[in-house]
Structures are given as structure tokens and as C-alpha cells.
A protein has these predicted regions:
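Surface-exposed, polar/charged faces of alpha-helical domains
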Residues: 37, 41-48, 52, 81-85, ...
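Early exported N-terminus immediately downstream of N-terminal targeting peptides
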Residues: 22-102
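Short beta-strand edge/turn micro-motifs at domain boundaries
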Residues: 143-169
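Positively charged n-region of N-terminal signal peptides that target proteins for export
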Residues: 1-5
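N-terminal signal peptide c-region/cleavage motif recognized by signal peptidases
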Residues: 15-18
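Surface-exposed, charged secondary-structure patches
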Residues: 100-142, 194-222
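Sec-dependent N-terminal signal peptides
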Residues: 6-10
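Low-complexity, intrinsically disordered terminal/linker segments enriched in charged
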Residues: 159-222
């Protein structure tokens, strides 16, 4: 599930300049094509440059993903029981988790393509499901549906369903178990610790790559 989620997220990106009149399927296709064009030509992103990957994620996905709705749905009844401080802390860490997952996926792109299925939507509808299929060279295609909700300014994504498994449902099950056993504060702390560890690892990796570059240049000159 996680590998397929990573792949789906790597192909999902929503433009800051999307028009409110743009349909959900048009938005998905246009912006997915845009982000794939960047990834195909950016060797640093393909090599896993976390700084560039996170910058791309922050620019493209954050303003156009309904993190508030996702957070409420993922926590379920625990959202209504949470304090304002807990809600804020959870949203910060969960948002970071999703961006980090997206960033990891972005560096794993290897010439996948997307096929878009025809979409039917009733006039005046405020929710929509955009159905796609990710085609992998030498591999089985993966069915991915993006669920969007119409906001005053534009359509925004609030769930991704991969081969019948919902991102929201998947995380809700994981988080509910931790909350039952140890409480919401424990979940928030675990997410924060995981995010910090990943950030430190990324910083170390980027530093190592930067230090290696001059050495390689010197070696070539010799």
C-alpha cells in the first residue's frame, strides 16, 4: 500500500494558479502533466535533493490540498474530542508527514505515465472523483482515484483512493489504534519524532552530496 501511495502522490500536484472555473479532471490532468515535465528534466529531484523536492511540494501541493478536511476525517471522532492546541499540533505534523511522503515519492519517478478516465459529474456538484490509471513500464497498472471538493476559489483534493484503498481510511485506522492505546498526544509526538528524524536524515544526505561534488570535480581534473 505505501509503495503505491508514494507513486500516486508523486504524480499528484495542484497549481497555485488554478482557476475556480477549471473542472476537477482538467485540474488533475494539467497539473500532473506540469509536475511530470519538471521531474523528467530535473536531475537533482531525481537524485533525491530534498531541498528542491520540498520546495516543489510546498509550491504546488500545499495550497491546493484541503489539509483541514483531511485532518478532521483522519482523526474522526477524536477530532471533536481534541483541544485546539492538539488539533493545531496534529495538523502541523500530519501535513509535514504528507509532504515528506510526497517528496520521497517524487524522487522515485521512473517514466510512469497517467491515463485519465472519462468523468461524469452532475451540474452544480461540489464533490468529484477523478479516476486515473498509472502505467508502469514492465509493471501492472495502478488504479488511482482523486477525490476533490469544490471550494470558493478552486477544487481541492481531500482523499486519494488507490486500488480501492483510501488514504484517509488507511491513516485513520493506523492513528485510531495509537490513540486508543496511548492517546492523541502520543500520536502527535510520534509523528513529530518521525518528521524530525527524516529531516535530519535528509539534511545529512544533502550535506554529503554537496561535499562530494568538489571532490569529484578535483578527481576529474587530476
Amino acid at each position: 500500500m505505501m509503495k503505491k501511495l508514494l507513486l500516486a502522490l508523486s504524480l499528484l500536484c495542484f497549481s497555485l494558479t488554478a482557476l475556480a472555473t477549471e473542472g476537477p479532471d482538467e485540474l488533475v490532468k494539467r497539473t500532473a502533466d506540469d509536475v511530470l515535465a519538471v521531474v523528467k528534466t530535473d536531475k537533482d529531484i531525481q537524485a533525491g535533493d530534498q531541498q528542491k523536492i520540498f520546495a516543489l511540494a510546498e509550491e504546488k501541493i500545499v495550497p491546493n490540498f484541503n489539509f483541514d478536511k483531511v485532518s478532521r476525517m483522519v482523526l474522526g471522532k477524536n477530532w471533536t474530542k481534541a483541544t485546539l492546541e492538539q488539533k493545531t499540533a496534529f495538523q502541523v505534523e500530519f501535513r509535514t508527514l504528507l509532504i515528506r511522503t510526497y517528496a520521497t515519492a517524487l524522487s522515485k519517478y521512473r517514466n510512469q505515465t497517467i491515463e485519465y478516465k472519462p468523468m461524469r459529474m452532475a451540474e452544480g456538484a461540489t464533490t468529484a472523483s477523478v479516476k486515473t490509471q498509472i502505467v508502469q513500464p514492465g509493471g501492472q497498472p495502478i488504479e488511482v482515484n482523486y477525490t476533490l471538493e469544490k471550494q470558493p476559489e478552486a477544487w481541492k483534493v481531500y482523499d486519494i483512493v488507490i486500488e480501492g484503498v483510501s488514504l484517509v481510511t488507511n491513516y485513520r485506522g493506523q492513528f485510531a489504534q495509537e490513540i486508543r492505546q496511548n492517546g492523541l498526544d502520543s500520536l502527535i509526538k510520534k509523528l513529530a519524532d518521525k518528521n524530525k528524524a527524516a529531516q535530519a536524515k535528509a539534511a545529512s544526505s544533502n550535506a554529503a552530496s554537496s561535499n562530494a561534488a568538489p571532490s569529484n570535480t578535483a578527481a576529474n581534473q587530476n
